[in-house]
A protein has these predicted regions:
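Hinge/cleft segment of the Venus flytrap/periplasmic-binding protein
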Residues: 51, 183-191, 202, 302-348
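Extracytoplasmic "Venus flytrap"
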Residues: 51-74, 83-96, 106, 112-116, ...
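Hydrophobic alpha-helical
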Residues: 111-131, 199, 215-281
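Short, solvent-exposed amphipathic alpha-helices that sit
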Residues: 63-80, 158-165, 190-209, 225, ...
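Flexible loop/hinge segments that line or gate small-molecule binding clefts
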Residues: 121-157, 276-284, 288-289
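Bacterial lipoprotein signal-peptidase II cleavage site
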Residues: 19-46
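Sec-dependent N-terminal signal peptides of Gram-positive bacterial secreted proteins and lipoproteins
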Residues: 2-24
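Hydrophobic alpha-helical segments within soluble ligand-binding/sensing domains
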Residues: 49, 94, 150-178, 226-227, ...
């Protein structure tokens, strides 16, 4: 009887041991498959270090959403988890999100600035974290260093492409004196300032004397805003030869306003920037004369790769297919590309 009891006890011990082993194996699998808010395996990719990277977005729009998707795809490919947070154009939220990433133990953060003058505060909030600014260049480029870099496009270049297209258009008509309506983005923002300066200075260099048909319209990069603001000019009889817009959305607002006023938008050149899907369609149809492709995918994937390069101690342009600035090694440029009726099919 004692032997039977002993045998039963030994069997129970053995079963408990086997159950414990099975429980440990199950727990390891669960840990390996755990998901972050980015929806990717936290253990994928190379080992060591915090595998989470936060992208702090100034706001959501069509173009920036494409940038986010490209950054997330690049993160996933390299075995990192990306979490995107939207500041809703609130400077204070940007600081809070950066601090949260730092407190979570993240080692690098990607920031699309709400305000270019905010860069110093972002770097301070990041503490020991490395920072990649994307798309919006800090107002003070002297803040950039081996731990704080920029990936984006040279905004002045977009204006240069607009001006060259307009100069060619008007010279073909034998015209060197023109009046323009200017649709500005967010006032004070680097993209607004540099795109505007680029187009106006290059028109002068090209021998085109361009004067304002009205005061610039500050439309905040918004289609509906542009439509509302330009409509009174169209119905008041204001004379103009072209519409220069800091982005496609505002240019498309002007197109809609002209159609609403029974005017043909293809009768004069309307130029934009970004080459959004709608912008490309407008160029193809003739409603817009041209746009300038701003590579959202290149900026998003380039920023993520630069962030990973900083973590690994590699040059920031490694594996990006891009080049650093000739004078500032902490800037990686993503080139703009002019888009006209001749090549728009390549962008659709």
């Amino acid at each position: 009887m004692n032997k039977k009891i002993l045998s039963i006890l030994l069997s129970c011990v053995l079963l408990l041991a086997l159950a414990a082993c099975g429980g440990n194996n199950s727990g390891s699998a669960s840990t390996g498959d755990s998901q972050t808010s980015g929806g990717m395996s936290s253990d994928s990719g190379s080992s060591g270090g915090n595998k989470n990277i936060t992208l702090v977005l100034s706001q959501r729009d069509e173009w920036l959403s494409t940038l986010v998707d490209a950054a997330e795809a690049a993160a996933k490919e390299k075995g990192y988890n990306m979490n995107t947070v939207d500041c809703l154009s609130d400077v204070s939220k940007a600081i809070q999100f950066v601090e949260s990433a730092r407190n979570a133990g993240e080692e690098v953060v990607i920031v699309n600035l709400v305000d270019p003058s905010q860069a110093g505060e972002i770097i301070e909030a990041a503490g020991s974290m490395k920072v990649v600014f994307v798309n919006r260049l800090p107002g003070d480029m002297g803040l950039l260093n081996e731990n704080a870099v920029y990936v984006g496009s040279n905004e002045r270049e977009a204006g240069i492409y607009q001006a060259k297209a307009l100069a060619e258009y008007f010279k073909a008509q034998g015209k060197t004196e023109i009046k323009y309506i200017l649709l500005n983005g967010i006032l004070g923002q680097a993209s607004t300032i540099n795109r505007t300066e680029g187009v106006l200075s290059t028109l002068a260099e090209e021998g085109i004397n361009a004067t304002e048909a009205s005061a610039p319209l500050a439309c905040d990069y918004d289609r509906a805003n542009a439509m509302d603001q330009i409509s009174p000019l169209l119905t008041s009889g204001t004379q103009f030869d072209c519409i220069i817009s800091n982005n496609d959305a505002m240019a498309l607002g002007a197109v809609e306003a002209m159609k609403g006023a029974n005017m043909d938008p293809s009768a004069l050149p309307i130029v934009g920037v970004d080459c959004t899907a709608d912008g490309a369609a407008a160029v193809a149809s003739g409603d817009m004369y041209m746009t300038v492709f701003q590579n959202a995918v290149g900026q998003g994937s380039g920023a993520m790769q630069a962030a990973i390069n900083l973590l690994n101690g590699d040059p920031i342009d490694t594996n990006t297919g891009l080049s650093v600035d000739g004078e500032n090694p902490h800037i990686v440029w993503v080139p703009f590309e002019p888009v006209t009726a001749d090549n728009v099919a390549n962008y659709q």
